[in-house]
Amino acid sequence: AILTFAQNFTIDDYEKEEVYIEMRDGAKLFTSVYTPKDKSQKYPVLIKRTPYSVKPYGADTMPQKLMHNTELVASGYIFVNQDMRGRWMSEGEFENTKPPYSWSDKKRTDEVTDSYDTFDWLKKNLKNFNGNIGQY
């Protein structure tokens, strides 16, 4: 049997990047990306989209912890936190509980299209991303 040992990542093992991800209608959503400093392997992404702020803001400002589940942090993920449309540092108009629109209307936006556009950007722009995304 082959034994593998997961690296135990802590907040000190991550670097932070802040980006604005452009949606299909041109609105830019503020996004904090926390990537493991170890670039020797590829990692899955866990993304949180929230109306309640992804602070702390500032590329050199790290949170006290990336998430409450320390086992996930220790396992090594790319963590992505995004201010939802129209909230905090993101552009656009916030609409609480907006119903999803039909995919046939390419100009209308909702939380589904914003998630899709974000996932697409991550897939195309993140280095060391293994292609797996989970949203929490």
Language-model-detected regions and their locations in the chain:
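Bacterial N-terminal signal peptides
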Residues: 1-4
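N-terminal cap/lid segment of alpha/beta-hydrolase-fold proteins
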Residues: 7-41
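Cap/lid segment of the alpha/beta-hydrolase catalytic domain
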Residues: 42-125
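Alpha/beta-hydrolase fold nucleophile elbow
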Residues: 127-136
